[in-house]
Amino acid sequence: MIAALFCTPGLARSANIVIWPVPTSSLPSHIPADSAALNPALPGAAPALPTHIGKYRVLGKLGEGATSDVFLCHDDFHGRDVAVKRVRPNPGGDASEARYSERFFAAEAALVGRLQHPNVVQIFDAVADPVAPYIVMEHVAGNTLRPYCRADQLLSLELIVEIGFKCAMALGYVFRQGLIHRDVKPANLLAVLTHGAITDVKITDFGSVLNLESEVTQVYRVGSLAYMSPEQLDGAALDCRSDMYGLGAVLYHLIAGRPPFDAQVQAAMVHQVYNAQPASLCGMRSGLSPAVDAVIQRALAKNPGDRFDNWDQFAQALSDLILQRQVPRGQLQGVLDSERFNLLRSLDFFTSFGDVELWEVVHRAKWQRFNFGHALYRKGDEGRTFHIIAQGALEVFRDGQKVAQLGAGTSVGEMAYLAPNPELRRHSADVIVSQPATTISFTPDTLTQLAPGCRHLFDEAFIRVLVRRLHAAHEALAHPRRIL
């Protein structure tokens, strides 16, 4: 039973709401908005920026919400820009609101250094300042997805599906850490911009997170009405499928230019969430297939049991839309990150790599396409680049005689990479492309750019390769006729 819904009348479709079983005054959102600073110290004058927030040098203001301000700062110790979200001092304010703000801060502060995923904003630091506590986060060059929900700024279908895939993988990672975000919405998804184009997405703002492993009393029934699942609105027990509903609602909004449920009156909005079915997306966008609509509608099912069973299943359904050409290819004519990720997952070399490490390889590796007959290596050449075959095949020739054929998932050139001196780095055979091949490659310099955990997995993979080759060499010596 809902005791109270707190949001601005007439703004039900976009309002951030907090639901408690006790009466209180209207609680403002704790989520920083995309708006410019609107808190002047004097009429018509913006407040002066602080020079520092703790040890962080203030460079400018990124935005503000009802209870907090977000500043662009520089961390001189680590030599990086950061985003600092500082709770705005509110002396004499409502005590109950202050307590809830403290809990939101504590929920996010508990995640310092815990979430390490390329599509999740990192939380570097949290300082419980008695006047104005603040959270220090990774600074993302871009903006939220809110502008792309407008009918005149809609993204291409392929990009929306790609964003959905990355968010599903990231939220799956978050859930494996024992966390449910509970406020998945466009304003909490940051679009990473490179030369004005969206190249990645990151999930942010974990103030509403539900920690399934925490014994500390947590605030329940929080979220944004347009993206809240029925069970979250009920205050019922939640699992990953509640955030799944939220992501489905975000994707629906990005595709249609309006959320799945839309009402000016809050009570009508709640009724729709409980009882109405989202309108079909078919016909709302040119080129949108029934398969796309089916995936989104399943994520938005009223009953959690009718949604996808887990995040991997949801992510796979989104990926299949691209692989099966259910989404028209527009501006992203190249290979998408989701396609590369799934390709790596299928390769034997990467069997021990987790999702986080695979994403790192997707972004750090050099991806190359080679035509039939191309010489990847020539005997006598020196080099330390190693390749892992993602697609296609290579043939190895020694003194003009074919001695091996290498297929997908096989590494080549790792001996020269691992060799301790230049003489041993000379290739002992010709390696020629026998079927058009896609490879990913690293050098010692590019491999050092990977996180230590990812480099360790490469070392383990190299050891497995060397053990297999030593075993094959032993078999060749023991049974020469069998090998020949």
Residue ranges of predicted features:
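Conserved N-lobe ATP-binding subsite of Hanks-type protein kinase domains
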Residues: 69
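AlphaC helix of the eukaryotic protein kinase fold
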Residues: 88-114
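Activation-segment/catalytic-loop signature of the eukaryotic protein kinase fold
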Residues: 126
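Conserved short submotifs of the Hanks-type protein kinase catalytic core
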Residues: 130-144
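Activation segment signature within eukaryotic-like protein kinase domains
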Residues: 163-164
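Protein kinase catalytic-loop region centered on the HRD/HxD motif
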Residues: 168-179
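Cyclic nucleotide-binding regulatory domains
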Residues: 374-436, 447, 463
